[in-house]
Design a protein with these regions (language model features):
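Short amphipathic C-terminal alpha-helix that caps PH/PH-like domains
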Residues: 1-2, 219
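Common nucleic-acid-contacting/processivity interface regions adjacent to the catalytic cores
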Residues: 17, 53-63, 232-258
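N-terminal accessory regions of nucleic-acid-interacting proteins
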Residues: 2-59, 68, 105
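Generic beta-strand/beta-sheet core signal
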Residues: 49-52, 78-80, 122-123, 251, ...
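Active-site-proximal helix-loop-helix substrate-binding element of RNase H-like nuclease domains
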Residues: 17-28, 70-73, 79-227, 237-238, ...
Protein backbone atom coordinates (compact mmCIF):
# COMPACT_ATOMS: atom_id res chain seq x y z
CA UNK A 1 0.00 0.00 0.00
CA UNK A 2 1.00 3.65 -0.14
CA UNK A 3 3.33 3.40 2.84
CA UNK A 4 5.39 0.66 1.22
CA UNK A 5 7.71 2.91 -0.72
CA UNK A 6 11.10 3.45 0.96
CA UNK A 7 10.46 6.14 3.47
CA UNK A 8 12.43 9.37 3.46
CA UNK A 9 11.60 9.39 7.09
CA UNK A 10 14.32 11.40 8.74
CA UNK A 11 13.20 14.94 9.35
CA UNK A 12 16.74 16.24 9.72
CA UNK A 13 16.16 18.76 6.95
CA UNK A 14 13.24 20.26 8.83
CA UNK A 15 14.10 22.76 11.51
CA UNK A 16 13.71 20.96 14.83
CA UNK A 17 11.05 22.55 16.94
CA UNK A 18 12.79 21.77 20.21
CA UNK A 19 16.21 22.92 21.25
CA UNK A 20 18.04 21.13 24.00
CA UNK A 21 20.70 23.33 25.53
CA UNK A 22 22.04 20.64 27.83
CA UNK A 23 23.47 18.03 25.47
CA UNK A 24 25.76 15.87 27.62
CA UNK A 25 29.39 15.70 26.56
CA UNK A 26 29.59 11.89 26.76
CA UNK A 27 26.37 10.10 25.95
CA UNK A 28 25.50 6.48 26.76
CA UNK A 29 26.01 4.00 23.90
CA UNK A 30 22.99 2.67 22.01
CA UNK A 31 22.76 0.95 18.64
CA UNK A 32 19.01 1.43 18.33
CA UNK A 33 17.82 3.28 15.23
CA UNK A 34 14.27 3.96 14.01
CA UNK A 35 12.95 1.90 11.08
CA UNK A 36 13.98 3.08 7.59
CA UNK A 37 10.64 1.95 6.20
CA UNK A 38 7.36 1.98 8.09
CA UNK A 39 6.36 -1.60 8.96
CA UNK A 40 3.70 -3.48 6.99
CA UNK A 41 0.73 -4.13 9.25
CA UNK A 42 -1.96 -5.37 6.83
CA UNK A 43 -1.44 -9.07 7.59
CA UNK A 44 -1.03 -8.71 11.35
CA UNK A 45 -3.50 -10.59 13.57
CA UNK A 46 -3.43 -7.92 16.24
CA UNK A 47 -1.54 -4.69 16.93
CA UNK A 48 -0.51 -3.06 20.20
CA UNK A 49 -0.05 0.71 20.40
CA UNK A 50 1.72 2.57 23.19
CA UNK A 51 2.51 6.29 23.14
CA UNK A 52 5.38 8.18 24.73
CA UNK A 53 4.28 11.72 25.47
CA UNK A 54 5.29 15.06 26.86
CA UNK A 55 2.40 15.43 29.31
CA UNK A 56 3.64 18.15 31.66
CA UNK A 57 0.68 18.43 34.07
CA UNK A 58 -0.48 14.81 34.10
CA UNK A 59 -0.21 14.50 37.89
CA UNK A 60 -2.01 17.74 38.77
CA UNK A 61 -4.56 18.09 35.97
CA UNK A 62 -4.85 14.66 34.35
CA UNK A 63 -4.03 13.76 30.76
CA UNK A 64 -3.08 16.80 28.69
CA UNK A 65 -4.70 15.65 25.45
CA UNK A 66 -8.06 17.16 26.36
CA UNK A 67 -6.55 20.65 26.58
CA UNK A 68 -3.73 20.12 24.06
CA UNK A 69 -1.22 20.54 26.86
CA UNK A 70 1.91 18.71 25.67
CA UNK A 71 2.58 16.56 22.60
CA UNK A 72 3.22 13.02 21.35
CA UNK A 73 6.94 12.17 21.41
CA UNK A 74 6.68 8.78 19.75
CA UNK A 75 4.56 5.73 19.05
CA UNK A 76 5.53 2.14 19.92
CA UNK A 77 3.91 -0.65 17.91
CA UNK A 78 3.74 -4.39 18.43
CA UNK A 79 2.62 -6.39 15.39
CA UNK A 80 1.62 -9.99 15.95
CA UNK A 81 1.80 -12.46 13.07
CA UNK A 82 0.87 -15.91 14.41
CA UNK A 83 3.46 -16.59 17.13
CA UNK A 84 5.82 -13.87 15.96
CA UNK A 85 5.77 -10.37 17.42
CA UNK A 86 7.65 -7.51 15.74
CA UNK A 87 8.12 -4.28 17.68
CA UNK A 88 8.89 -0.76 16.47
CA UNK A 89 9.22 2.73 17.87
CA UNK A 90 8.42 5.72 15.68
CA UNK A 91 9.87 8.89 17.25
CA UNK A 92 8.22 12.12 16.10
CA UNK A 93 8.58 14.68 18.88
CA UNK A 94 11.86 14.16 20.73
CA UNK A 95 13.55 17.35 21.80
CA UNK A 96 17.06 16.59 20.62
CA UNK A 97 16.15 15.51 17.07
CA UNK A 98 16.50 12.05 15.54
CA UNK A 99 12.79 12.03 14.73
CA UNK A 100 10.98 10.57 11.75
CA UNK A 101 8.89 12.83 9.54
CA UNK A 102 5.74 13.35 11.60
CA UNK A 103 3.32 13.82 8.69
CA UNK A 104 4.42 10.47 7.24
CA UNK A 105 3.98 8.74 10.58
CA UNK A 106 0.62 10.44 11.04
CA UNK A 107 -0.67 9.21 7.66
CA UNK A 108 0.60 5.73 8.38
CA UNK A 109 -1.11 5.64 11.79
CA UNK A 110 -4.36 6.96 10.30
CA UNK A 111 -4.41 3.96 7.95
CA UNK A 112 -3.55 1.52 10.70
CA UNK A 113 -5.99 2.90 13.27
CA UNK A 114 -8.91 3.03 10.83
CA UNK A 115 -8.38 -0.62 9.83
CA UNK A 116 -10.34 -3.58 11.20
CA UNK A 117 -7.33 -5.13 12.93
CA UNK A 118 -7.86 -5.43 16.71
CA UNK A 119 -5.88 -2.73 18.49
CA UNK A 120 -4.59 -3.39 22.00
CA UNK A 121 -3.71 -0.66 24.50
CA UNK A 122 -2.88 -0.53 28.18
CA UNK A 123 -5.18 2.24 29.39
CA UNK A 124 -6.66 2.90 25.95
CA UNK A 125 -8.34 6.21 26.81
CA UNK A 126 -4.95 7.82 27.36
CA UNK A 127 -3.43 6.74 24.04
CA UNK A 128 -6.64 7.25 22.05
CA UNK A 129 -6.87 10.76 23.49
CA UNK A 130 -3.35 11.66 22.40
CA UNK A 131 -3.82 10.06 18.97
CA UNK A 132 -6.87 12.32 18.68
CA UNK A 133 -4.61 15.37 19.00
CA UNK A 134 -2.88 14.11 15.84
CA UNK A 135 -6.25 13.88 14.11
CA UNK A 136 -6.17 10.07 14.25
CA UNK A 137 -9.36 8.14 15.01
CA UNK A 138 -9.06 4.65 16.45
CA UNK A 139 -11.69 2.35 15.00
CA UNK A 140 -12.86 -0.72 16.95
CA UNK A 141 -12.14 -3.45 17.81
CA UNK A 142 -10.27 -1.86 20.71
CA UNK A 143 -8.84 -4.01 23.49
CA UNK A 144 -7.52 -2.74 26.81
CA UNK A 145 -5.27 -4.89 28.99
CA UNK A 146 -6.11 -2.69 31.98
CA UNK A 147 -9.84 -3.45 31.63
CA UNK A 148 -9.04 -7.12 31.14
CA UNK A 149 -6.91 -7.21 34.26
CA UNK A 150 -9.60 -5.54 36.37
CA UNK A 151 -12.17 -8.12 35.24
CA UNK A 152 -9.84 -11.03 35.97
CA UNK A 153 -8.69 -9.79 39.37
CA UNK A 154 -10.57 -6.90 40.95
CA UNK A 155 -8.55 -7.12 44.18
CA UNK A 156 -5.15 -6.14 42.85
CA UNK A 157 -3.34 -3.20 44.38
CA UNK A 158 -2.22 -1.87 41.02
CA UNK A 159 -2.86 -2.34 37.33
CA UNK A 160 0.34 -0.88 35.92
CA UNK A 161 1.74 -2.51 32.79
CA UNK A 162 5.03 -3.38 34.45
CA UNK A 163 3.61 -5.17 37.47
CA UNK A 164 0.95 -7.03 35.45
CA UNK A 165 3.58 -8.07 32.92
CA UNK A 166 5.84 -9.44 35.64
CA UNK A 167 3.05 -11.23 37.51
CA UNK A 168 1.18 -12.73 34.59
CA UNK A 169 3.53 -13.23 31.66
CA UNK A 170 6.95 -13.04 33.30
CA UNK A 171 7.85 -10.00 31.24
CA UNK A 172 8.49 -6.72 33.03
CA UNK A 173 10.24 -3.65 31.74
CA UNK A 174 14.01 -3.57 31.60
CA UNK A 175 14.94 -0.03 32.53
CA UNK A 176 18.70 -0.39 32.99
CA UNK A 177 19.70 1.21 29.70
CA UNK A 178 17.09 3.94 30.10
CA UNK A 179 18.17 4.74 33.67
CA UNK A 180 21.85 4.93 32.71
CA UNK A 181 21.11 7.28 29.85
CA UNK A 182 18.66 9.22 32.02
CA UNK A 183 21.32 9.85 34.64
CA UNK A 184 23.62 11.27 31.97
CA UNK A 185 20.83 13.55 30.74
CA UNK A 186 20.01 14.61 34.30
CA UNK A 187 16.74 12.71 34.79
CA UNK A 188 16.21 10.19 37.59
CA UNK A 189 13.40 8.14 39.12
CA UNK A 190 9.88 9.39 38.51
CA UNK A 191 11.38 12.42 36.84
CA UNK A 192 12.85 10.14 34.17
CA UNK A 193 9.51 8.94 32.72
CA UNK A 194 8.12 12.44 32.44
CA UNK A 195 11.22 13.61 30.57
CA UNK A 196 11.89 10.76 28.16
CA UNK A 197 10.77 12.99 25.30
CA UNK A 198 13.75 15.24 26.08
CA UNK A 199 16.15 12.36 25.49
CA UNK A 200 17.27 11.05 22.09
CA UNK A 201 15.05 8.34 20.58
CA UNK A 202 17.97 5.87 20.64
CA UNK A 203 17.58 5.61 24.43
CA UNK A 204 13.79 5.57 24.50
CA UNK A 205 13.23 3.23 21.53
CA UNK A 206 14.20 -0.08 23.18
CA UNK A 207 12.17 0.77 26.30
CA UNK A 208 9.09 1.85 24.34
CA UNK A 209 9.22 -1.24 22.12
CA UNK A 210 9.24 -3.37 25.24
CA UNK A 211 6.02 -1.69 26.40
CA UNK A 212 4.37 -2.66 23.12
CA UNK A 213 5.67 -6.23 23.46
CA UNK A 214 4.48 -6.66 27.07
CA UNK A 215 1.06 -5.22 26.14
CA UNK A 216 0.64 -7.83 23.39
CA UNK A 217 1.85 -10.72 25.56
CA UNK A 218 -0.44 -9.59 28.34
CA UNK A 219 -3.43 -9.45 26.02
CA UNK A 220 -2.68 -12.94 24.70
CA UNK A 221 -2.74 -14.22 28.28
CA UNK A 222 -5.82 -12.22 29.32
CA UNK A 223 -7.76 -13.35 26.26
CA UNK A 224 -7.31 -16.99 27.32
CA UNK A 225 -8.16 -16.28 30.95
CA UNK A 226 -11.28 -14.26 30.07
CA UNK A 227 -12.41 -17.14 27.89
CA UNK A 228 -11.74 -19.61 30.70
CA UNK A 229 -13.77 -17.53 33.18
CA UNK A 230 -16.63 -16.89 30.74
CA UNK A 231 -15.88 -13.17 30.76
CA UNK A 232 -15.18 -12.66 27.06
CA UNK A 233 -18.58 -11.14 26.25
CA UNK A 234 -18.49 -8.84 29.25
CA UNK A 235 -14.95 -7.73 28.42
CA UNK A 236 -15.94 -6.93 24.84
CA UNK A 237 -19.00 -5.04 26.01
CA UNK A 238 -16.86 -2.86 28.30
CA UNK A 239 -14.17 -2.29 25.71
CA UNK A 240 -16.69 -1.40 23.03
CA UNK A 241 -17.70 1.55 25.21
CA UNK A 242 -14.21 3.07 25.06
CA UNK A 243 -14.87 5.27 21.97
CA UNK A 244 -17.97 6.66 23.66
CA UNK A 245 -16.08 7.34 26.90
CA UNK A 246 -13.43 9.11 24.82
CA UNK A 247 -16.07 11.23 23.07
CA UNK A 248 -17.60 12.20 26.42
CA UNK A 249 -14.26 13.09 27.96
CA UNK A 250 -13.30 15.06 24.88
CA UNK A 251 -16.56 16.99 25.08
CA UNK A 252 -15.88 17.66 28.76
CA UNK A 253 -18.13 19.43 31.22
CA UNK A 254 -18.30 23.05 32.19
CA UNK A 255 -16.55 23.74 35.47
CA UNK A 256 -16.73 26.98 37.44
CA UNK A 257 -13.12 27.42 38.48
CA UNK A 258 -14.10 30.06 41.01
Amino acid sequence: HSMGRPARLRSDTKKETYVNLQQPLFDEESDWIPPEVLPEWENADVVSIDLETNDPHLKEKGAGWATRDGHVAGVALGLQFGDRIDTYYLPIGHEGGGNLDSSWVQRYLKDLCSSQIPKVFHNALYDIGWLGTMDITVRPPIRDTMYGAALLDENRMGYGLDVLGRDWVGAGKDEDQLSKAGAIWGFKGKNLKANMWRMPPKHVGPYAEQDALVTLKLWRYEEEMLERDDLTKLAQLEMDLIPMLYAMRKQGIRVDVE
